[in-house]
Amino acid sequence: MYIVLEGIDGVGKTTQTEKLKEWLEKRGFSVKTIVEPTDSDIGKIIREELLKPEATSDTNQQMLALLFAADRLTLKDEINQVKNNQQKILISDRSFYSSITYQNSTTIEPEWIYKINKHTPRPDLTIILDIDEDEALKRCDKIDTFENKEFLEKTRENYLKLVKTEKNIVKIDATPTEDVVQDEIRNQIIKYLKL
């Protein structure tokens, strides 16, 4: 099974991914976590590009969307191996939905992002952790190119659109404590896996 945690920067994806992994392992599942961008050579280029001030320009967003699509293909075999195995779970901190929400601008249509990610495995379940932009900014350890209120607001709106248009996506309010949010994530996993 391939589970993805999504949401704007500062929402707590990394913390919740770690907590979910521990819980699933205690329940007898074999669990691996991954993060986007990956540690591949392509992922390293992406990380460097994300740090540049011009990273949010439309041209750079187009380039990043292509790089992310290529980076995701480095995970394709690994994801496909666990997708049909109920005892193995792969939890990803981000997926191609991040490209749809982050690289979505006036010059980049979501349809193009879907097209360049055509060969990327789709998650079995995506959980969008949702908080408002002000709370996200308070939680961010450091401010980077993508962590400004206007950009986070637009990105959050794009995530909320996905909840309405895509299958197997649920939204969880990430405002409460980490433990309350984790309980809600577990409830969604229990419901999906019919545990």
Swiss-Prot record:
Its EC number is 2.7.4.9. CDD domains: TMPK. ATP binds at G7, I8, D9, G10, V11, G12, K13, T14. GO terms for cellular component: cytoplasm. It comes from the Archaea. It catalyses: dTMP + ATP = dTDP + ADP. One of its GO terms (molecular function) is dTMP kinase activity. The keyword Glycosyltransferase does not apply. Pfam families: Thymidylate_kin. One of its GO terms (biological process) is dTTP biosynthetic process. Keywords: ATP-binding, Kinase, Nucleotide biosynthesis, Nucleotide-binding, Transferase. The keyword Transcription regulation does not apply. HAMAP family: Thymidylate_kinase. Belongs to the thymidylate kinase family. This is Probable thymidylate kinase. The lineage of its organism: Archaea, Methanobacteriati, Methanobacteriota, Methanomada group, Methanobacteria. The gene is tmk.
